[in-house]
């Protein structure tokens, strides 16, 4: 048995779903800086209003349950989670407790050189609460967020490092985006996590479990775990475990610390029961099968294909799969005949750089795979050098014209052997002294002759062919 303390983490990951309507109303599911513009009577719990289940959100939930290898429920049913808080207009939240859409899942993800097995307790669909805005002398309620559809993934306590946690969260985020289930934008608060943390030694828990609620952003999640791990370690090593309590804490972004909210003794009894306004209904197997067929190739599947079948290295493959649209662009390039390594290099080096500069999506990028092929074909045929190709790439973006407009005789690479050989013979004839010195051991003069050729051709001479001919002619 190890004498070291082991970090144990479980995650409850909430993600806002992509849908025109809210989870249980026809209210618009949108983001606005103006308060209370996306609300409906159902969202604000007006008397006499009844919920209606958003079928699209149920479909999203089923897809994610399948991705997580969960056992998918035969019957869809919803419960009421009862508690009072100003941001909860109904006095309860519609969620799933007794029969989640998916249970007992398992996911394997690579972390460094190992494979991490993540056990999924359940995945369930629920609605979000309203948001409170606190001011000096008052607090206001914004109902825009009330009723926004959320999907919550609950893991078992199976993580032993922040690296494992972030790897899992990033993978799930990418799956949401690949399947068009959510934009999963942490900057907009579309992903929030409750993080459960405690320590083990010799296979036994030695500190009480602490839940850090509602942490937004992967950096904050990592910081919260690291702080809580150190806080509990310090208490254990100084024989102060008795001072630790099972409690709920919140993360303070300003200090990168966690702050106590309530202890187990103050925990809320939510008194879950089946929502009488939403009768349970059967999930048709044919519909579930149709949904599963819509799931595209996921990030790690594509990465494996890119590395094993297309010969890409880990770095390039990892960059390509980060964005589904970039991966789609790459695959279109390969389909139309661009060499996979050439396409990957242009995308990861040139195109991604341009996208980062502008902040645009590759869907809005001017150069299509077909245009990129014009450039790569010109390099392959010797019409353009790599340097000239980059210039054509830049001119294409700047002028919004086809690359072929700039691949002309005026800027084409000189690759005709007879033309180059005649020119090189003339240059050597005019530099006999340098030729003699080169033949007597001053090998660095070879670059001098290359420079003379490039100067005379204004950089258009094929560099490979130039060096080949120079080696032959300098010996004569």
Per-segment meaning from a language model:
Residues 443-476:
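Short, amphipathic C-terminal "tail helix"
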Residues 228, 333, 346, 350-354, ...:
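Amphipathic alpha-helical segments in well-ordered regions
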Residues 362-373, 377, 386-455:
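Strongly charged, low-complexity linkers/loops
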Residues 336-337, 343, 351-366, 374-379, ...:
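M16/insulysin-pitrilysin zinc metalloprotease superfamily fold
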Residues 189-201, 270, 307-331, 340-358, ...:
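Core structural elements
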Residues 3, 311, 334-343, 383, ...:
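Structural motif
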Residues 316, 329, 339-347, 371, ...:
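Residue-level detector of well-ordered alpha-helical segments, enriched
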Residues 1-297, 314, 335-339, 349:
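Basic, nucleic-acid-interacting segments
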């Amino acid at each position: 048995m190890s004498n070291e303390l082991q970090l144990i983490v479980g995650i409850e990951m909430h993600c806002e779903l992509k849908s025109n309507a809210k989870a249980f109303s026809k209210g618009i599911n949108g983001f606005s800086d103006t308060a209370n513009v996306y609300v409906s009577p159902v969202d604000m719990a007006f008397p006499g209003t009844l919920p209606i289940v958003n079928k699209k959100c149920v479909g999203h939930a089923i897809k994610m349950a399948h991705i997580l290898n969960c056992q998918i429920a035969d019957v869809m049913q919803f419960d009421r989670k009862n508690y009072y808080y100003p941001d909860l207009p109904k006095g309860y939240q519609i969620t799933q407790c007794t029969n989640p859409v998916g249970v007992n899942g398992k996911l394997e993800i690579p972390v460094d050189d190992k494979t991490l097995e993540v056990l999924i307790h359940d995945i369930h669909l629920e609605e979000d609460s309203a948001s409170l805005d606190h001011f000096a002398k008052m607090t206001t309620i914004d109902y825009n967020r009330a009723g926004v559809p959320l999907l919550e993934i609950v893991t078992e306590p199976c993580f032993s490092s922040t690296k494992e946690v972030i790897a899992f969260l990033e993978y799930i985020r990418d799956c949401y985006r690949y399947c068009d289930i959510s934009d999963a934008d942490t900057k907009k608060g579309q992903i929030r996590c409750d993080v459960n943390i405690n320590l083990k030694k010799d296979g036994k828990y030695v500190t009480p479990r602490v839940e850090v609620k509602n942490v937004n952003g992967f950096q904050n999640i990592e910081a919260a775990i690291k702080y809580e791990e150190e806080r509990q370690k310090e208490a254990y090593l100084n024989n102060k475990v008795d001072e630790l309590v099972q409690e709920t804490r919140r993360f303070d972004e300003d200090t990168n610390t966690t702050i106590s909210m309530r202890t187990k003794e103050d925990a809320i009894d939510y008194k879950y029961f089946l929502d009488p306004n939403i009768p349970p209904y059967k999930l048709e197997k044919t519909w579930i099968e149709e949904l599963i067929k819509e799931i595209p190739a996921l990030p790690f599947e594509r990465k494996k294909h890119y590395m094993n079948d297309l010969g890409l290295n880990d770095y390039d493959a990892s960059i390509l799969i980060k964005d589904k649209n970039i991966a789609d662009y790459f695959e279109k390039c390969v389909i139309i005949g661009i060499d996979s390594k050439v396409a990957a290099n242009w995308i990861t080096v040139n195109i991604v750089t341009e996208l980062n500069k502008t902040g645009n999506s590759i869907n809005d990028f001017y150069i299509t795979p077909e245009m990129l092929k014009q450039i790569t074909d010109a390099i392959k045929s010797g019409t353009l050098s790599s340097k000239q190709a980059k210039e054509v790439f830049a001119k294409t973006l700047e002028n919004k014209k086809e690359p072929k407009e700039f691949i002309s005789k005026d800027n084409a690479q000189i690759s005709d052997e007879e033309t180059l050989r005649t020119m090189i013979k003339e240059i050597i004839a005019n530099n006999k002294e340098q030729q003699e010195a080169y033949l007597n051991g001053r090998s660095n003069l070879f670059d001098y002759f290359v420079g003379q050729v490039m100067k005379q051709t204004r950089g258009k001479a094929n560099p490979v062919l130039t060096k080949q001919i120079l080696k032959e002619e300098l010996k004569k």
